[in-house]
């Protein structure tokens, strides 16, 4: 948690429960209702959705459009004085040149939603927004911070968490005199509003963050309600696999990774949590046989890096699972799959389409 002292106090942390509301019986039109404007989704009627266990083949969730900002003329209330997650006291006086770095791309999506995309000067590979596409990548080997690349950009503010690192890199940036704020978001469906508001407070935009948080929660509630209408009464049994290449980076995502929230958010059963798997368990043949998922979710880059579906099926144990036998693999863009930011509702709805109504995806 962050203690923020400024003229405008830290935006109220709003703990909103995600609950299901009534959905239309015949068709669910998931328009942004003038609130976001960046996506419109239509799910078929429940009577038009077949048995998802009869669906075969790989399905891909496409890249999302950039988030619509709540303002195009943000005016941060600075300075902001805070104590970050590592216990350092930081004064944020300038948000004109921001680097926002995390494994999931959550921070750049949130800052874009707050109207600060023009202030972002670099990115990680997970920040895939079109508006940021021409910015330099300041990570190497996936998600290792390149300190030299960071300092060369002369940032006025670095926002980061320990989902990337190493910790020594963050220490070096701080030691170079760059105001550096280490965050500690929860990254769950229920914490979306809180996480947005905490970041908004850091950059001096608490009111804008509250608007973005409210909009995001409304979208999540609406979309989860719609998903409930088409999800089967007998839920699909699913795992989230994390893969990079054909070596040892091949894990079943478990407790604390966000996979449970994502899978349960679309009305499926997360087999990893059902079997009390820890943060990331090796996806060996024994573990896969024990879980025997009916569908597998992966990051798009993960499936590509392992050689596509052909390469994945060569992995010990995959072809023997129900998911492998039916090639029932769903991929989500790397920068969106576990971000749990302001595009969470869209992530859930697009994943639900891929699971239950691929013709609508």
Q: For the regions a protein language model found, what residue spans apply to each?
A:
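Bacterial Sec-exported substrate-binding components of ABC uptake systems
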Residues: 2-26, 31-104, 207-238, 357-361
